[in-house]
Structure formats: structure tokens, C-alpha cells
């Protein structure tokens, strides 16, 4: 992943253009854009292709970043997969459940690493890789891997990690929609031996079981922060994936995690991570 070229799907739109420009200035190796209506044109001095296949064939890109409206995501993502893209980072939110089930099916079938949807993306400061919408003001090279379901809390953790001179080795927003595409085992097959990472901060919340996949992990030092402890049952909080219910009660989750790891009472306790 660290040396691969990147296709920006949605580069020609205002949102995609803005964040692609920031990523390029940061140092990310984005080489092309995708828009069949604007094929042959240049945006940010990057060629715009009519299809993922042509972009992969000509530029040899293996990663795509998705900035397009959710209605079009399924077809573009499946086209990415068939064209040879191996890693897909989806910023778009509110992809329908049916479309996400199809996307997950194809990602599993073709062994694709999919991050999102409704994700701020991923940033790796040491390698100047920014795939998504992370603000770079507080990004500094360090040894803390921040893994979060909430984009806003990720940004706060980044700011506090800089303030406490921890820095970041890698920051990942897994996505806030009800169905996310991330395969934890596949993601860690890429990054689990990432030498720059000393500690991992997992920011969990209501409505998710993904934290449970870390309970028996011992290769790195892990710290947790779980938000939403006072949230009412059966009420969506913030985004569609954040809902507390009797099948995944947050207090039971915290009790289970406490058996294995330290849970921060609030993110200001990030200074406890050493």
C-alpha cells in the first residue's frame, strides 16, 4: 500500500477536488481522476479517465478514494474491483443497505480491503499518505495508531495526541454507517507489523461490536475509549450506525473490555498512553 498509485473517484466535483488537492500537497501519490463525462481533461494536472479500467491500465494505480454521491457508489466500486483496484477508501455516506451488502459481497469475493463508507479515511504521516478528509494541522509523526468509528472523536484524539507529544503512526476512521466494509483481519494483515506503531487507541461507541475483535490481541499495547455511555436505548445518536440496543448494550461492552484493557474515562486522559 505504501508505494501504490491512487485513483481519485470524484476529483472533478467540488468536494473531491478540494480534498484531493490537500492530499497531493501533503505528498500523497494521486495520479488520476474518474469521470466519463469529462474524460481527457485535466484537473490538478491529473488526467481524467472514462473508466477505472483505463486508469488502472495506463497509470497502474491499485488504490481508489471515493468522493462521489452515494447513489452512484455501488457501480463505481464494483467497477473499481473488476478493474484491478485492491484497496478502496469510501468517504461517501448513506449508501443503501442493499448496495452495501452487494459491495461487501464483491469485496469478500475478490479479497479487497474496503474502508468506509462514511469514513474520514486513513492517514499515515511518516509516508505522507492521506486518503480521505483528515485535517492535517495536528498531524505529526509519532507512535500512536488511532482506530475509530467516529470521525469527530478521531480529530479530537489527533489534536490531543499532538498536545501530549505522542504523535500518530496511523489514523483510521472505519466508517459510521450501519454496515461498514472493513475486514479487520485483512486490514491488520497490511499493518499489524507496522514498526512505527507502539500503542493503539481504539475509539468505540454504541451500536458496534467491532471492539470485541481486539479483546485477545496482545502484539501491541491497546487502550480504549468508549463513547455514548449515557445514550438512551433504541435512539440513533449522531449517525446511522450509532444506536444503543439490548443486543449490544454499551455497559456490557465496557465490562467485557475492562477484563483485558485500560479504558479511558475521556479522551483528555490520552496522556496515560505511554
Spell out what each predicted region is.
Residues 1-274:
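Catalytic-core regions of core metabolic enzymes
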Amino acid at each position: 500500500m505504501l508505494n501504490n498509485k491512487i485513483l481519485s473517484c470524484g476529483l472533478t466535483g467540488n468536494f473531491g477536488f478540494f480534498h484531493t488537492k490537500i492530499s497531493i500537497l501533503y505528498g500523497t501519490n494521486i495520479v488520476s481522476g474518474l469521470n466519463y463525462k469529462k474524460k481527457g481533461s485535466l484537473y490538478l494536472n491529473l488526467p481524467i479517465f472514462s473508466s477505472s479500467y483505463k486508469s488502472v491500465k495506463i497509470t497502474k494505480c491499485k488504490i481508489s478514494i471515493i468522493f462521489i454521491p452515494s447513489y452512484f457508489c455501488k457501480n463505481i466500486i464494483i467497477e473499481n474491483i473488476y478493474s484491478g483496484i485492491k484497496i478502496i477508501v469510501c468517504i461517501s455516506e448513506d449508501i443503501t443497505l442493499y448496495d452495501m451488502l452487494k459491495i461487501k459481497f464483491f469485496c469478500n469475493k475478490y479479497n479487497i480491503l474496503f474502508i468506509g463508507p462514511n469514513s474520514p479515511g486513513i492517514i499515515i504521516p511518516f509516508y505522507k499518505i492521506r486518503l480521505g478528509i483528515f485535517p492535517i494541522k495536528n498531524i505529526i509523526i509519532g507512535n500512536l495508531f488511532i482506530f475509530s468509528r467516529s470521525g469527530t472523536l478521531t480529530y479530537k484524539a489527533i489534536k490531543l495526541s499532538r498536545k501530549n507529544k505522542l504523535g500518530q503512526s496511523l489514523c483510521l476512521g472505519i466508517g459510521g454507517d450501519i454496515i461498514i466494509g472493513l475486514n479487520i483481519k485483512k486490514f491488520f494483515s497490511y499493518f499489524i507489523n507496522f514498526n512505527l506503531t507502539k500503542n493503539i487507541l481504539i475509539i468505540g461507541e454504541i451500536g458496534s461490536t467491532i471492539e470485541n475483535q481486539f479483546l485477545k490481541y496482545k502484539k501491541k499495547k491497546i487502550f480504549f475509549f468508549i463513547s455514548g455511555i449515557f445514550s438512551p436505548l433504541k435512539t440513533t445518536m449522531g449517525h446511522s450506525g450509532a444506536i444503543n440496543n439490548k443486543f449490544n448494550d454499551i455497559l456490557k461492552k465496557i465490562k467485557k473490555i475492562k477484563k483485558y484493557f485500560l479504558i479511558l474515562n475521556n479522551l483528555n486522559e490520552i496522556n496515560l498512553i505511554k
